Amino acid sequence: MSSRKQARLEAKNFIDSLSVQPYPNSKKAYIQGSREDIQVPVREISLADSLVGGTKKEPVFEPNVPIQVYDTSGVYTDPTHQIDLYSGLPKLREQWIDERGDTELLDDVSSVYTKERLEDETLDDLRYGNLPRIRRATDEQCVTQLHYARQGIITPEMEYIAIRENMGRQKFADEQLNHQHPGHNFGANLPKEITPEFVRKEVAEGRAIIPSNINHPESEPMIIGRNFLVKVNANIGNSSVSSSIEEEVEKLVWSTRWGGDTVMDLSTGRNIHETREWILRNSPVPIGTVPMYQALEKVNGVAEDLNWEVMRDTLIEQAEQGVDYFTIHAGLLLRYVPMTAKRVTGIVSRGGSIIAKWCLAHHQESFLYTHFREICEICAKYDVALSLGDGLRPGSIADANDEAQFSELRTLGELTKVAWEYDVQVIIEGPGHVPMHLIKENMDEQLEHCHEAPFYTLGPLTTDIAPGYDHITSGIGAAMIGWYGCAMLCYVTPKEHLGLPNKEDVKTGLITYKLAAHAADLAKGHPGAQIRDNALSKARFEFRWEDQFNLALDPETARSFHDETLPQESGKVAHFCSMCGPKFCSMKISQEVREYAKDTEQVAADQAIEIKMLDNPLEGMRQKSQEFRDTGSELYHPAVGAKEAQLEE
């Protein structure tokens, strides 16, 4: 069997046998909102008790409160839910949308292409079988979260997000857990508690978006903005030479498990429409696309043959399926193309290269630019957010921050204002390949020229010399630009520049970028960001190995690395690891020092000797030397109670 057939078979088996898979020692918990149907998911990590004293026979323990963390995995980690990918996810937002009374259910699809696909009987085996009815705004209505926010309306989505962003941190009274270093937020507004009104205000001002197509009611509301937690996007999608529908659905579920806040379906191969339907019906997170890719397939891959009619039908097709945000490369103007002639790597964006080729072939501005207002009208009817694409992003360090890149950025700022006229939500896409010392300039330019609309960047990669490790080269840049104010980071996998990522590459990219996003939240001083770090550090100091694993971003890898050298169960309670061994563990020695300091009698004796040393230095040193030998010539001595408790080892 070929490797491709094997991969598809494995993915199909995954789909057919998918069951709830909670994280180790974690449970899905829900925080109740103001109404019965606002139940916000968090992952609650249970921790072992801390040994604080006593004896071997009667040890004294202190409980550790469970840690709640942001959870993107949907019902896939909820044991009360029966997983069935053929039926899709619960329609969480359907009632909220219906209650607003500004949408209608359509009797038929509006897209010509969708009608053709539905009438093609050869696609029956591929098609998602439980197609929902399509919603659209009623005449003269706008159904975007930005529109509601500007009207002063706090939607259920906004309340849901406020609860989600706080992650239940209000319940932590432990001073040690709540300790947090002051951050440097570069002008961001980070309140101690996120309220629904704060969410509404940020959305109304255009500083944040809530991607929430009315035809994707399965999605759990989330927010993208620099005054909130930094988010991470995962890219999936087939190509003309690799992957299948089953594999892409598998990657979707995998992405949400490992922290993908949104997922972009960048499919360019066969059956794009059917693949996207399966993904949307089973996605608890917002889904983004680049409609240009599918439009190009419709004209057999000939960029010059693209036109507004094909693009318009594609936008409607995808909006009615439920796509939450479109990447639109409308800021690439004809006069910017010559600016790329002297670049080392030219135009590296797929969408950008398609538009550039079309502009040159027709010697006019692209239909995305000339029909931009019509694009906004379509988006307003379904609440599709616009992710204004950076078609001229630098593809190499040499091309960073050049005239072409920043010219397009300024045009994106102009288009942002146009979209806001229609109450359409907007984020701005950014680079790319940028050395560390030029990254902040990108953030500063974006804030100035794009009116504080959220920034969404691919990395940036900080060096070009590490194919196979570009998740690391870009993770460095992602952490930096997240700190400076970038709202969402698009992950990069180890396969970047080399091939289509598989399931494990997706996980590696996501863990790397969740790490970068969290580091940025810490640096900004986002309230409560340090709680998980503090809990893990406490577990590490107390040798609670299982708690260390379970609090990690990737518990499986942390546990497997530990067990490579200490696989026995006794290794899970040992007061050392294989790095230093039992005699040289700094944590163990520090514990012994701490216990030693608690011995008040010894402290008093030390003080007496110190006085004697001042009176008679030679006699004092002789006594200290004799004391060291008399107590076994050991560097550190734990208190008696602690030593007895550790005899269990």
Curated annotation (Swiss-Prot):
Residues 621-632 have a biased composition (Basic and acidic residues). Keywords: 4Fe-4S, Iron, Iron-sulfur, Lyase, Metal-binding, S-adenosyl-L-methionine, Thiamine biosynthesis, Zinc. Its EC number is 4.1.99.17. Zn(2+) binds at residues 433, 497. Substrate binds at residues 235, 264, 293, 329, 349-351, 390-393, 429, 456. Binds 1 [4Fe-4S] cluster per subunit. The cluster is coordinated with 3 cysteines and an exchangeable S-adenosyl-L-methionine. Residues 620-649 are annotated as: Disordered. GO terms for biological process: thiamine biosynthetic process; thiamine diphosphate biosynthetic process. HAMAP family: ThiC (MF_00089). Belongs to the ThiC family. The keyword Metal-binding applies. Catalyzes the synthesis of the hydroxymethylpyrimidine phosphate (HMP-P) moiety of thiamine from aminoimidazole ribotide (AIR) in a radical S-adenosyl-L-methionine (SAM)-dependent reaction. [4Fe-4S] cluster binds at residues 577, 580, 585. The keyword Metal-binding applies. Pathway: Cofactor biosynthesis; thiamine diphosphate biosynthesis. Homodimer. It comes from the Bacteria. This is Phosphomethylpyrimidine synthase. One of its GO terms (molecular function) is carbon-carbon lyase activity. InterPro entries: ThiC, ThiC-associated_dom, ThiC/Bza_core_dom, ThiC/BzaA/B. Its cofactor is [4Fe-4S] cluster. It catalyses: 5-amino-1-(5-phospho-beta-D-ribosyl)imidazole + S-adenosyl-L-methionine = 4-amino-2-methyl-5-(phosphooxymethyl)pyrimidine + CO + 5'-deoxyadenosine + formate + L-methionine + 3 H(+).
